[in-house]
Amino acid sequence: AVCVSLLGAANIPPHPFNLINFMKMIRYTIPCEKTWGEYVDYGCYCGVGGSGRPIDALDRCCYVHDNCYGDAEKKHKCNPKMQSYSYKLTKRTTSAMVPQVLVHVLSVIVTARQPSASAILNTSSGTRILTPRDIADDI
């Protein structure tokens, strides 16, 4: 339930990077008791880099997250951590205008964070609701 806590740097000042914006969206939508600092050097994959076999479910989530961003970089020749998008936070829900290239990345992270959750993303081709099934279909 804390899979995106490595992004949960609530005490980091705002930056124009999508990774920071996405962290804010997740923290607002699904408040968490842990902070980014508690996971920055956890297991084999939470934090910068990663290798070996994940040590537990949380570390496995970080592994999935790392691979998801890596796949987006390879397949779409982009840097999903830096790609900007706009979002609006209201009443613990998130509405975002997300480039299509990031839909897969966001679905993996949102679903990893809260497996029963769904995310509504507004893409250039229309509104898309992402559920855990999207991960099975996209991976």
Curated annotation (Swiss-Prot):
Main location: secreted
GO cellular component, one term: extracellular region
Tissue: Expressed by the venom gland.
Disulfide pattern: 46-62
Catalytic residues (UniProt): 65
Ion transport listed as a keyword: no
The reaction(s) this protein catalyses: a 1,2-diacyl-sn-glycero-3-phosphocholine + H2O = a 1-acyl-sn-glycero-3-phosphocholine + a fatty acid + H(+)
InterPro entries with a match to the protein in the record: PLipase_A2, PLipase_A2_dom, PLipase_A2_dom_sf, PLipase_A2_His_AS
One MF term in the entry's GO annotations: calcium ion binding
Residues reported in the UniProt entry to bind Ca(2+): 45, 47, 49, 66
Keyword line: Calcium, Disulfide bond, Hydrolase, Lipid degradation, Lipid metabolism, Metal-binding, Neurotoxin, Presynaptic neurotoxin, Secreted, Signal, Toxin
EC number: 3.1.1.4
CDD domains registered for this protein in UniProt: PLA2c
Pfam family name, one: Phospholip_A2_1
A Gene Ontology BP annotation from the UniProt entry: phospholipid metabolic process
SMART domains for this protein: PA2c
Gene3D superfamilies in the record: Phospholipase A2 domain
EC supergroup of this enzyme: hydrolase
Propeptide residue range(s): 10-17
Domain of life: Eukaryota
Cellular localization per UniProt: Secreted
Family: Belongs to the phospholipase A2 family. Group I subfamily. D49 sub-subfamily.
Subunit structure: Heterodimer; disulfide-linked. The A chains have phospholipase A2 activity and the B chains show homology with the basic protease inhibitors.
Its biological purpose: Snake venom phospholipase A2 (PLA2) that shows presynaptic neurotoxicity. PLA2 catalyzes the calcium-dependent hydrolysis of the 2-acyl groups in 3-sn-phosphoglycerides.
The protein's name: Basic phospholipase A2 beta-bungarotoxin A2 chain
